[in-house]
Amino acid sequence: MKITDLTDSPKETKRFRVFLDNDKHYDFGLRNSKNGTYIDHKDKIKRENYRKRHYNMKREQPYIKNLIPSPALFSYYLLWGDSTSIHKNIQALNKMMHNNI
């Protein structure tokens, strides 16, 4: 599975929409978040706190750990990924998903 496109979400409360090569799409990220995300503020401490908090949520962990397409996965790796560039984070996640096949 591969991310093929990223656009602004048409949903009022979501920030982005990703499109996958299987014709599915997912809306994710809180629009107009007052605190922003790692791609906005570039604060590594906030990023680590977000990752720990969300990885330990029973509802989100299986999606993140097993690279299952979901809003939780895309927020974790694209908005709070290793890079402050969402496009670099897309490349990294695509590589991880390809290697996970």
Q: Where does each model-flagged region fall?
A:
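Arg/Lys-rich, low-complexity, intrinsically disordered basic segments
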Residues: 1-101
